[in-house]
Each structure stands twice: as C-alpha cells, then as structure tokens.
C-alpha cells in the first residue's frame, strides 16, 4: 500500500498465486514456489522473445533457424540480463526487459504487418507504466519507428500510426487501473501518474499526427524531418508547461 517507484501490479501478480496456494501447501511453501516460478517463467518468455527476434534477423538471409539457435545461446550467456531472472527476483527489471524485447519484435515486423506496431506500442506503454526505466525504452522505440518512417514512409506509415495508438491507449488504460482518482492530478515524476500519462499521450499523439499530415508536408525527407522536428518540439514544450515540477529529474517531487 505504500508509494513505490515501480507499479504495484507486479506485487499483485506475485501475491495472488501465493494467496491461492497457501490453503493447499502453506504460506511458506507457497512463497518458495513463487520465488522460483515467477522469475523462471519470465525468463522463459524473455528467451522465447530473444529467439523470435533473432529469427527475424536471420530470415532476411534465409537463415532463420540458425539465427534462432544463436539467439538462444547468446540470450543464455547474457549474464547482465538473465541474472535479473534469478530465483527470488521480485522486482520490475525483468518485466522491463521483456517489454523491451516485445517492442523490438513488433517494430521488426511492422513493415509486413503494420498492426504489429499496436502491440509494440502496448509493450512500451506497459514498460512506462511499470517504472521510470520505460521512458528511455519509449523514446528509443518512437525514434526507431520515426526513422523508419522518415526513410520509407510508404512502408512504415501505418505501423507508426498503430504504434502511437498502442502507446496512448495502453497508458490511458493503465493509468485508470493503477492510479487512484484522488491521485490523478498529482505530479509524480518517478512512477505512474499524470506526467507518465502525458509522456505517452504526447509521444503517441505525435506518431499518429505524423501519418495524418497532408502529403505536401511529407513529400520529401527534408519536409518529413521538419514536420517531425516541429511536432516533437511542440510535444516536449507542452510537457514542460504541464509538468514543470518534473523538469529537475525523476525525484523532483
């Protein structure tokens, strides 16, 4: 019940199985089970995403299977990442890693399947709603999708729009679910609150706006750069005006 710098939906996801298992095996045994099942289950998801991303890379050269094996081996040896999934790892870092990998997979598939941008955006929204580490993830995802649109607008415009919609929609839903109405206007800068929602709505809104611009403003790469820069600057300025207390950093409030 205390304010935390990461979303307490993780606590609920861990506590619920413990509560259900306690009448069957006792609380101590239930906690031990979850100390193993939770992080190792997340590790399985992370490894699956690593394999899928690697397969997407290898498929470009007709080497999907070989790349998948390489991804599995590299993922297993990536100690700075996989140590976040060790038994008893009850925090948010493993969730952030999974959200990041899911967003990467969605971005990679966006050209062939534009709606992949929707669940890539939802993953970025969940990452931001979970903890402040989601801010650089969201920035990187938007920049990557924006660069793809700048260089190949015909291939990536729809995907960029879906990405923006996924970010804005997921953060709106998560804000309503995770933040009490009495806290909606409180400028919390290090966890889910109005500023994080603002970041998502502005970032997602800019992505959607870019693909809705008149053709005259997106005809050449120079015009696309100018349009994206103008909208980005306006978005950042709007956030600064709405949440000046957060300008000093995550722990300003």
Regions found by a protein language model. Give the residues of each.
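Short hydrophobic/aromatic helix or loop-helix immediately within or flanking a transmembrane segment
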Residues: 1-27, 127
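Transmembrane catalytic cores of multi-pass membrane glycosyltransferases
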Residues: 96, 118, 123-253
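Transmembrane helical cores of multi-pass ion-transport proteins
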Residues: 27-32, 74
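Extracytoplasmic/secreted proteins, especially bacterial periplasmic and envelope-associated proteins
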Residues: 8-15, 36, 40, 49
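Membrane-embedded helix bundles of polyisoprenyl
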Residues: 38-60, 64-150, 163-182
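Interfacial loop-to-helix junctions that mark the boundaries of transmembrane helices
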Residues: 32-34, 88-90, 191-197
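Membrane-interface interhelical loops and short amphipathic "cap" helices
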Residues: 25-29, 82-87, 182-192
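Short linear capping/connector segments at secondary-structure termini
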Residues: 1, 30-35
């Amino acid at each position: 019940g205390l304010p935390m710098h990461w979303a307490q939906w993780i606590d609920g996801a861990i506590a619920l199985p413990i509560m259900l298992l306690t009448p069957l095996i006792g609380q101590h045994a239930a906690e031990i089970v979850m100390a193993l099942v939770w992080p190792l289950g997340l590790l399985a998801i992370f490894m699956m995403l690593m394999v899928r991303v690697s397969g997407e890379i290898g498929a470009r050269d007709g080497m999907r299977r070989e790349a998948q094996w390489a991804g599995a081996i590299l993922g297993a040896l990536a100690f700075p990442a996989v140590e976040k999934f060790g038994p008893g790892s009850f925090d948010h870092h493993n969730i952030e890693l999974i959200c990041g990998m899911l967003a990467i997979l969605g971005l990679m598939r966006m050209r062939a399947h534009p709606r992949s941008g929707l669940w890539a955006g939802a993953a970025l929204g969940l990452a931001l709603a979970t903890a402040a580490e989601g801010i650089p993830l969201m920035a990187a995802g938007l920049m990557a999708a924006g660069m793809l649109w700048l260089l190949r607008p015909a291939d990536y415009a729809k995907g960029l729009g879906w990405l923006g919609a996924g970010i804005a929609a997921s953060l709106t839903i998560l804000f309503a679910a995770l933040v009490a109405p009495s806290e909606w206007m409180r400028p919390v800068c290090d966890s889910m609150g109005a500023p994080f929602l603002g970041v998502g709505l502005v970032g997602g809104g800019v992505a959607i706006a870019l693909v809705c611009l008149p053709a005259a403003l997106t005809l050449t790469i120079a015009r696309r750069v100018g349009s994206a820069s103008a909208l980005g600057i306006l978005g950042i300025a709007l956030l600064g005006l709405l949440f000046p207390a957060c300008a000093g950093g995550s722990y300003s409030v």
